Every structure is written in C-alpha cells, then in structure tokens.
Regions:
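Bacterial Sec-dependent N-terminal signal peptides
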Residues: 1-23
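Oxidoreductase and adenylate-handling cofactor-binding alpha/beta cores
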Residues: 122-130, 158-159, 165-173, 202, ...
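Catalytic beta-strand/loop cores that center a nucleophilic Ser/Cys/Thr
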Residues: 51-54, 75, 134-208
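Short, flexible, glycine/charge-rich loop motifs used to bind or transfer phosphoryl groups or to couple energy/partner
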Residues: 18-21, 68-71, 163-165, 197
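Active-site donor-binding loop signature of nucleotide-sugar glycosyltransferases
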Residues: 111, 179, 211
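A glycine-rich, often tryptophan-bearing local segment used as a flexible ligand/cofactor-contacting loop or short
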Residues: 86-153
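Helical hinge/lid and interdomain linker segments adjacent to catalytic or ligand-binding clefts
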Residues: 22, 26-31, 36-114, 218
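Extracellular ligand-binding/catalytic regions of CAZymes and related secreted enzymes
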Residues: 22-30, 53, 71, 184-193, ...
Length: 237
C-alpha cells in the first residue's frame, strides 16, 4: 500500500503542471456510496491522494446525508460525487441543485455521476446526461480528444472498459468522444457518443467523464487521469 501511494504521488506530480487552476485552500466535498460494483471507495481513495497533493481543504462523506443542508453545501467550491443508482430525497435534490445553481461546481466519472438517481429528471437536467447502456460490457474502444482548453496536449487513447451509451443534453460542450460499431447492436454502427463534457448550470459548472468502470483506469491511463483532474479543476468555483 505504501509503495502504491508513493507511485501515485509521483504520477500526480508528473501530470499537473500544464493546467493553471489551483485547488490550494479550495473547499472540496467528496460524496460516495450507492452500488459497490463501481468501487466508489477506491475512486475516492485516488481522489483523496490527489486532493492532498493539491493542498485542498476536503471532506469525504459516505452517503446522501451530505446533501441534507443547503447552508453547508454552499460553503464548498466543488462537489465530487461517486454514487451509482441510489435514491435521493426531494429535499436533498433541492439542496444540491440550488447549491450548484448558486456557484458550487460538481464533477465525477462513469455511473457515479450519470447513473446516480434514475428517478430524478431534475438531477439529470443538471448533469447533462444519463447512462442507458454499455453494449458488450467491458470492451476495447478508442477515446478521441476534441479541441478544448481541457484537452490541450492530451492524446487519443485506447482503453478497455464500459463504452457508455448516453442520453444527453445537446447543450453540453463535448470535449472527448467515441464511436460505436455494429458488433452488439447493428443499428448503432457509427454512432458518435460523448465520453467527456462540460456545461453550466446557473452559476455552477459541471464536468463529467464516462470512463472509470474500474477506478484504476485513471491510474493506468495517463490521458484519462489528466482529463479527469483538469475537468474537476475547471468545475471548481
């Protein structure tokens, strides 16, 4: 474990000089829970190591009780969420959306952000999309970077993970995408789908990347980690 932590710190040091936003002294809330198949605790561990390196003020909370108070949420500059499925109460939903609308950023990956609360269309409207399928399960596919400040200097890459098929808001700014083939569903052959996007919701900013079925994907693929961490910095108030 100690060896892995040292490796992670060295890895992070090598990646974070190219994007100017600084998280030092920013207040970050990390919320995790839901379906354990997406290993939210491991995702949060990687995020925590990064936040320590960035010298951010952070709090980690397991469960949706983190959204019980708007007065507490509005104190944060960024919420990083990793909750697949689960159910959010109306009060929690209102608190979260109000905080983001008033300037708190939010970001996350994979099902931890776009498959969180399937019954909450208000939440989906804020995030900008909803997962609906991953044809073939874990498959090999290519992620293509599009021109944007967050992708500057990043390379396209091949990865084996779930290739998310999304229902998404045309108002999002897509910064990375992928193309489906006809292996599992012939009618989606050639469909181009977002892999990462950014958007605004009121005064708040939203960042999402769809890879990360196994959180270690972000450690094993340099460009994926850069994309995630740059996006989270961008979303920070």
């Amino acid at each position: 474990m100690k060896k892995n932590t040292i490796y992670f710190i060295l890895f992070t040091l090598s990646l974070n000089f190219s994007f100017s936003q600084n998280l030092k002294d920013k207040n970050i809330l990390v919320v995790w829970g839901g379906w354990e198949g997406h290993k939210p605790e491991l995702f949060v561990k990687h995020i925590e190591n990064w936040l320590i390196f960035e010298e951010a003020n952070y709090k980690i909370h397991n469960g949706l009780e983190a959204y019980n108070s708007y007065e507490e949420l509005i104190k944060y500059d960024l919420i990083i969420q990793s909750i697949t499925m689960s159910k959010i109460s109306k009060e929690q939903e209102n608190n979260l959306l109000k905080a983001i609308k008033n300037g708190v950023g939010i970001g996350g990956a994979h099902g931890g952000l776009t498959d969180s609360f399937r019954e909450s269309t208000n939440y989906q409207f804020m995030v900008g999309g909803q997962w609906v399928d991953h044809p073939g399960g874990e498959v090999n596919f290519k992620v293509k970077m599009l021109k944007d400040e967050l992708t500057k200097g990043l390379n396209d890459f091949e990865i084996k993970t779930e290739q998310y098929y999304m229902h998404y808001d045309p108002n999002i700014k897509v910064i990375a995408n992928t193309k489906f083939n006809d292996e599992y569903y012939p009618w989606i052959d050639g469909v181009v789908m977002p892999v990462a996007w950014k958007k605004e919701y009121g005064n708040g900013k939203v960042f999402y990347v769809s890879i990360g079925h196994d959180p270690d994907e972000f450690i094993n693929e340099e460009n994926a980690w850069k994309l995630l961490t740059r996006g989270l910095k961008w979303a920070t108030r």
